Amino acid sequence: KERGITILAKPTSVVWKDTKINIIDTPGHADFGGEVERILGMTDGVILLVDAAEGPMPQTKFVLSKALSQGLRPVVVINKVDRSDARAKEVINEIFDLFVALDANDKQLDFPILYASGRDGWCNYELDQKRENLHPLLDLILNHVNEPEVDLSKPFAMLSTLLHSDTFLGRCLIGRVVHGIAKVNDTVKSLNLNNNKVEEGRLTKLFTFSGTDKVATDTVTAGDIVCVAGLKITSVSDTICHLEVNEALKTTPIDPPTMSVTITINDSPISGLEGKKVTSTMIRERLLAEAETNVAISFAENEKKDSFEIGGRGELQIGVLIETMRREGFELSVSRPKVLFKDENNKKLEPFEEVTIDVD
């Protein structure tokens, strides 16, 4: 989390009544929008978590609109109902109005509601019921969310949705297996959105998720959310598949950067007073590592010596990167942001933002 907003999506899982439930937290901000759509593509249902006092927030509207457009049926959880300023009943009316405003269909409007306190670890269908545990939520997930439609007879195919770097394994790709089975040491290939082959490689390691840990496994099957290692240049939105497969899985392309800043070494008189990592080589390596694992960030070396151009989808995204680097002990100078233009068919195109202002 950063500034109260989830900025990275991380998968986990729990086993309840002999059923494995995969859980993924999505980012809630438009700057990380491409990731939201890809994450929702891995799911069969969603839990909409709303604060009992604050009600639906702007990011609630953004993520919910994406979920409803994909046909997912939400479970609504009103959290923090034990707050002194909680107004659960009013918040439910606000949520229903939001569903209607976002053109939810009849099935989506008939959403189940649970009242909860995440801090104390309980949830119930009614506010005055005994407050014990989260079993009602787990039971509701089993009853309300459809099982994944899988076909084990088809050749292996999975969609790369998340990317992270591991010191020992190198590039690791996380995604959901859509159909088929894969084993360690299988030879696979990857396809981009245009069905062009990206590379061919061997699956050196396979992991599933349990709690907050990655668990090594020899075999993965359709429906699993897995992490694979062994591919060197495959990225997010690529399809990892059996050598026989020639058609990539449909997904949302990565949103291009809309703005950039120039990052240089700190050459001010107070250089070196706060941070330990002050050289351009250190800054360059850190930015390259970020661009490798964060597909929404672009990196380019500037014509000017020791300066680097970093592109992202908004001020929040770039601000979070700079703040993280500062905490890690880096010192750097940052230019004012500039808008990125694009030339297409001899026309100059610029990014635009859609603003919705709610007035009560």
Question: What feature does the model see in each segment?
Answer:
Residues 1-360:
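Structural and coupling elements of P-loop NTPases
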